[in-house]
Amino acid sequence: VQELRVRIRWKTRPMRIVCVLWGEGDAPKLPMPCIRVRDLSAVNDLIRRTDCDAVLFLRAGLRPLDTDWVSELMQYAQRADVGCVGSALLDDRDCFRHAGYAVGVPGGAVSHQAGQWRYGRPYMLTDRIVRNVTGVSSALMMIRRDVFLSVGGFSPYQSDLRGADLGLKCQRIGLLNVYTPYARMAMDTRLSLLPPCLTQGAPKADLRRFRQTW
């Protein structure tokens, strides 16, 4: 397993990161080597066999919009009180497709600001501040390896309810999930809007499992 050692600007210790690039489509230009997988169904065992500090999950078809996006995610992921960290996913119209998950809705989980224009003025400008959320998308997620394994990794969802589920499992052990607006990704709409990137259109089996669990 190849690893990336990222030296956070205000830390003296290098952080070892494994990037898991998943899904179909071209890989974005990344500042790191990656493990390429077709889906996340067997990723739990892969992470168990690494000795990295943190794991970055990245969906093919995403393009970074912020230069220091890895450091931005890492500065929160390395905190002892934090579980999952994610950022905004924007479509080709500059509208939000994801900005952190909320739960307790008919679709299992819904994204904050979904469909809203990036340059709009949402309530309290919540798209522009670092804040706590219930969960973040597995399309762009960083989490410490020990936390990922301690909560059992990803549950077997076909949709991105896996991201909301992982966030809830982190909350259950007292950890926060963080949304930062400074690690944004542009989505290739030919690939990244298709399930299982987001929770829209989740299979009935996923919804049933999610409701029974939470």
Regions found by a protein language model. Give the residues of each.
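Short beta-strand-to-loop acidic/aromatic patch adjacent to the donor-nucleotide binding site
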Residues: 52-65
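Short beta-strand segments
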Residues: 21, 59, 86-89, 179-181, ...
